[in-house]
Amino acid sequence: MTLYRIALLTYSTEPRGSVIHTLELAEALHKLGHYVCVYALDKDGKGFDYTSSCDYDLVPAQAAPIDIDQLIQQRIQEFVSYLSQLQSVYDVYHAQDCISANALAKLVQQQQISSFVRTIHHIEDYSSHYLQQCQDRSIRNANLCLCVSDCWQKEIQRQYRIHAPRVINGVNLERFSPIANGLESSLKEQLGLSGSPIYLTVGGIEPRKNSIRLLQAFGQVLEDYPTAQLVIAGGATLFDYQTYRDDFFALADRLDIQIGRSLILPGVVSDAELPILYRTADAFVFPSTKEGWGLVVLEAIASGLPVITSNQPPFTEFLSETQALLVSPDSTDAIAQAMRSVIQPNVSRLLMQQSQSILSRYTWENSAKMHLHYYQNQITNIKTELY
């Protein structure tokens, strides 16, 4: 077996989906014997809150302008400046996002590297002309595009006329498990989780997480279950959703949903505490309107939680109606009814039993092997073009 030197690039050290994908893929490739180094923009100087057995290199990121176009431009240049000085040479340069892909495209243009791979987790609908150009360039200039779901594979083909082979996401069963480790009670006390039932979602407050409709649905649930609690964890994001957040909190005030009592907002949860947090909940609710895949859904299932999620791709690519309660993300009433149903013992028990079978299919080892197949093809193609 040929062993490769692989550079994986990600735009952040915060635990967003594509960042976790990068880190878990790196670990899996490392375990298969390949040398992997993760390059990540580190805007707060804190690095990863993640234990890694493979190398990583933190790319210094300075305070950026408020204007999003200028911010993205600066982040791309920070990557370019840092990578231009590297002495290390890799067989594969693999970007997991628009920012790092644009940086690699510049390095190809400057003839510092010969090619790069880009994983497209999803396509954004940018209102900014500059951001749309960045996204287009990150896709069109890549020598190989990969994607993580059938729905985005079709959309990439439709919008860009590019075939992006599909690779899978995975879930780390060494981290996410229904087996308690004795720290659940202390975390519940720390966060003020004394109610019942406890609903959890991960991803923060933002439009595509459908946070406002989830809050409206939770308001209905509180009428029947006044001691219920909704935990919205996470929230690290590159974009400013302040207007949406203001609307969210105004709604909470109108519905008299008290923060710290019924609504728990722990923010970004540490890598060590996240698996424990899943185990404190009674159900996982994720009525997202747009996802590349939905890693947190797999994490919740691995943690033994019954799941409510949207009745649309990509969720319907790996979940059936017997494995999760699939609801219209546009219907507050449907979300609320599912939240009432999912805590019924016969419903939750069946969902948990039926959903466990998907975990063996979605492993990071399987994902790494799929990546290696495409890496090998790409390396062969580049060598053929050179010689």
Regions found by a protein language model. Give the residues of each.
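Conserved donor-binding/catalytic core segment of Leloir-type glycosyltransferases
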Residues: A7, L193-K209, L215-F218, V231
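N-terminal strand-loop element at the rim of the active site
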Residues: L8-P15, L23, E27-Q74
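Short His-centered aromatic/hydrophobic patch
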Residues: A95-S100, I120
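Short alpha-helical donor nucleotide-sugar binding micro-motif in glycosyltransferases
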Residues: I139, V268-V269, I276-A281
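Nucleotide-activated donor-binding/catalytic signature segment of Leloir-type glycosyltransferases, i.e.
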Residues: R245-A272
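Aromatic "clamp/platform" in nucleotide-sugar-dependent glycosyltransferases that forms part
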Residues: T289
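Short hydrophobic beta-strand element within catalytic cores of glycosyltransferases
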Residues: V297, P306-T309
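Conserved acidic donor-binding segment of nucleotide-sugar-dependent glycosyltransferases
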Residues: E321, L325-T332, S341-N346
